A protein has these predicted regions:
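Fe(II)/2-oxoglutarate oxygenase catalytic core
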Residues: 1-163, 169-201
Length: 201
């Protein structure tokens, strides 16, 4: 049984930031990454990397088959919306993310999570997001900082050191490419209007 499956039965994290970062890195290594439809339009990534929404969506179908038939998404009983592909594939990850956020930013409520692997997103605004987001990064790499344009200055943050909280719907932000062999993961906790009921209740 891997750590993702264990989350349903017992706590995963220790309460020590760096130990828990190593645990989260191990968990993320067990996940198969790809790019969701919206992220494919933002940036090309090699197979095995990508950016995926873990949460709910109003889109009831995942894709169309060559025959024209729809592949339907699983319905989320908590919201009445539909689970994203990664949510259906890794349901136990929800408990892990809730435990982690309750440890390190318990005052922040969220209803969606973006999971990223080697995805140096270009400058953008998260126009659909509501309010602030919390970003945390993991991995052994050089550069790969999160850049935020604020007050006519560029801030560079290494989100491996502590959670980074900012309003991505109002502040232009992007990720520096890494310049060494290694893997950069990041998790972004946020809210959007499609989540309706909070996933962390």
């Amino acid at each position: 049984m891997n750590k993702t499956q264990e989350a349903e039965e017992e706590n995963v994290f220790t309460g020590d930031w760096y130990s828990d970062s190593a645990i989260m890195l191990e968990i993320l290594d067990q996940i198969t990454f790809y790019c969701g439809s919206d992220r494919k339009r933002m940036l090309y990534t090699k197979p095995g990397s990508g950016s995926m929404l873990y949460g709910t969506t109003w889109r009831g179908h995942l894709k169309y088959l060559p025959c024209g038939k729809q592949v339907l998404r699983e319905k989320c009983p908590d919201t009445g919306l539909f689970k994203t592909k990664i949510y259906s594939e890794y349901p136990h990850l929800k408990g892990i993310l809730k435990e982690y956020s309750n440890l390190y930013f318990p005052d922040f409520e969220w209803n969606q999570v973006q999971l990223n692997k080697d995805f140096p997103c270009p400058p953008h605004l998260d126009s659909d997001n509501v309010g602030e987001s919390v970003l945390v990064a993991y991995g052994n790499y050089l550069d790969g900082n999160t850049c935020i344009y604020r007050n006519e200055k560029i801030e560079k943050h290494d989100a491996r050191d502590k959670p980074l909280r900012f309003n991505g719907s109002k502040l232009l932000h992007w990720v520096q490419p890494i310049r060494s062999e290694g893997t950069r993961y990041s998790i972004v906790f946020f809210n959007n209007p499609y989540g309706l009921k909070k996933n962390n209740k």
